From Swiss-Prot:
Catalytic activity: 5-(methylsulfanyl)-D-ribose + ATP = 5-(methylsulfanyl)-alpha-D-ribose 1-phosphate + ADP + H(+)
Positions of ATP binding: 44, 61, 115-117, 250-252
Binding site for substrate: 233, 337
Sequence similarity: Belongs to the methylthioribose kinase family.
Key words of the record: Amino-acid biosynthesis, ATP-binding, Kinase, Methionine biosynthesis, Nucleotide-binding, Transferase
Protein name: Methylthioribose kinase
Described function: Catalyzes the phosphorylation of methylthioribose into methylthioribose-1-phosphate.
GO BP terms, alphabetized: L-methionine salvage from methylthioadenosine
Length: 394
């Protein structure tokens, strides 16, 4: 699909979104509906349509053909809406309790109609307020273990996988990730964004040849290792949760990539939240980091034993070893890019006072660099956490 809208594309409004829900038969025509645009992202409009009388709601998400923050001078493919709805449906085949149900999708209108999750909160916001989400890591570990196994070479016949990979060809959004995660933060690039007090530490990143070689190696893995269907943007802002329930959303960056990518991104975002905390308040994040890896290994291994193709059955140990090494490296890239790159996170940017924020951002750069440079030496998740704790003392 073109990067710009097709002739059938029409941008929804609150009134036309509500009318669409009725037209689809998701509400009765006599229902009294409210509709609010609630999206806080940069790439989509998100409408919450609600029938107060019957206490029933749904979400209508529409991709827009440009980045809101820039406007129409930065066109974006609306095919990402098809990618997102297809990924949610695929993920729902294996973990229906961990993703929103998709009720309807329209490729031309770039619309996905899905389950209302307004009873949950974005996990990043809750974590920043000190919530623990006791089931978060177990749920995400299960999500990773099942979704990453069942779309891989280890579970699928080669022809089936090739057809699936074609369906999830996602060049524009992969290019965004390549630039913002693996390239621009490691150069003195105009898109980078950081406090002037961090410049000497950013320059340390840019002048570290070993670190840049590591980032280039990880970029090559990201671009060339089409192991499985990955979410592509799995951070704490892409997860709704409460104390009991977890739902992974926003897989519009989905593509066939390395098993370790989603794992590394999620772990890095747990550690970014740990950097926003002090002392013993970090322990829940350490627990989540260990638990998500351990649960992933358990779930992935169980699926492997049950459903791995016979010709690949002997490869489990090597597959997990490579996934761990790459996840550590990808986590390092995520820590660095969220500190000095274009797209920041509130976990770091809302730390007060200012001097403390700068110190924590220095730590993020230091830890990220260590993970990239030493990913082959770190063999267990406890070693990853030990190196983090060694640097974060107060």
């Amino acid at each position: 699909m073109s990067a710009t809208k097709t002739s059938l594309y029409e941008q929804l409004t609150e009134s036309s979104a509500a009318a669409l829900a009725v037209k689809l038969g998701l509400f009765q025509s006599k229902s009294t509906l409210t509709c609010r645009e609630i999206g806080d992202g940069n790439l989509n409009y998100v409408f919450h349509v609600y029938d107060k009388e019957n206490k029933k709601g749904l979400i209508i998400k529409q991709a827009i053909p440009y980045a809101k923050v820039v406007g129409e001078s930065w066109p974006l493919t609306i095919d990402r809406a098809r990618i997102e709805s297809s990924a949610l449906i695929r993920q729902g085949e294996h973990v229906p309790h961990l993703v929103p149900a998709v009720y309807y999708s329209d490729t031309e209108m770039a619309v996905t109609v899905m389950e209302d999750l307004s009873h949950l909160r974005i996990s990043r916001k809750g974590l920043l307020e000190g919530q623990h989400y006791p089931n978060l890591s177990a749920h995400i570990g299960e999500f990773l273990g099942k979704t990453l196994f069942y779309s891989s070479d280890y579970a699928l016949d080669a022809k089936v996988k090739q057809q699936l990979a074609k369906q999830f060809t996602n060049p524009e959004l992969c290019n965004i990730t390549e630039r913002l995660v693996f390239t621009e933060p490691f150069l003195d690039h105009e898109t980078n964004d950081f406090e002037e007090e961090l410049r000497p530490y950013a320059e340390k990143v840019w002048n570290n040849s070993r670190l840049k070689e590591g980032a280039d190696e990880l970029k090559a893995i990201f671009l060339n290792s089409a192991e499985t269907l990955v979410h592509g943007d799995l951070h704490t802002g892409s997860i709704f949760a409460d104390e009991h329930e977890t739902k992974v959303i926003d897989p519009e960056f989905a593509f066939f990539g390395p098993i370790g990518f989603d794992i590394g991104q999620f772990i890095a975002n747990l550690l970014l939240n740990a950097l926003s905390r002090d002392g013993d308040d970090r322990q829940p994040l350490y627990d989540h980091t260990a638990a998500v890896w351990d649960t992933f290994v358990k779930t992935f291994s169980e699926a492997w034993e049950k459903d791995c193709l016979p010709s690949r059955r002997h490869l489990l140990e090597d597959t997990l070893k490579n996934a761990f090494e790459e996840a550590v490296g990808f986590a390092g890239c995520e820590l660095i890019r969220r500190t000095i790159g274009l797209a920041h996170v509130a976990d770091l940017d809302e730390i007060t006072p200012f001097d403390k924020r700068i110190e924590r951002k220095k730590l993020a750069l230091d830890i990220g660099a260590y993970y990239i440079e030493n990913r082959k030496e770190l063999k267990h998740i406890t070693e990853v956490l030990d190196q983090f704790k060694l640097r974060v003392k107060e």
